[in-house]
Amino acid sequence: MSISARFGPAGQADNYHGKSSVKYPAWLAERGLDAFEYQCGKGVSVGEETARAVGEAARAHGIQLSLHAPYFINLANPDPESRKKTTGYVLAACQVAEWMGAERVTAHTGALMKRSRREALDIALDT
């Protein structure tokens, strides 16, 4: 088995003074980094055109992409309407990741909400 490591930030670094996510992969490559996790922690708001452009820029500069799904995802929420919204957030994150050509989507699957791990898992599996 071959093990390799890539290094880069999750989100835009504080010392990146540009506003453009599309130009960020070039900035990372100039610093010797080769990975970037695009942050959708507060919601998925990037459009297809921008997502594809970020992906193209990342590939051009040898940057491996991943995407972080919204932080408020909770597959173990007992409320069916909330679980329906959660499913939508996960699918939206996956769609953007596909547009970007990201290797993976990072998602925190939720909180126990005063339930046992088994109860929370059963709810999540039903989602």
Model-derived regions, located:
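Active-site acidic/histidine proton-transfer and metal-coordination neighborhood
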Residues: R59, A76-T127
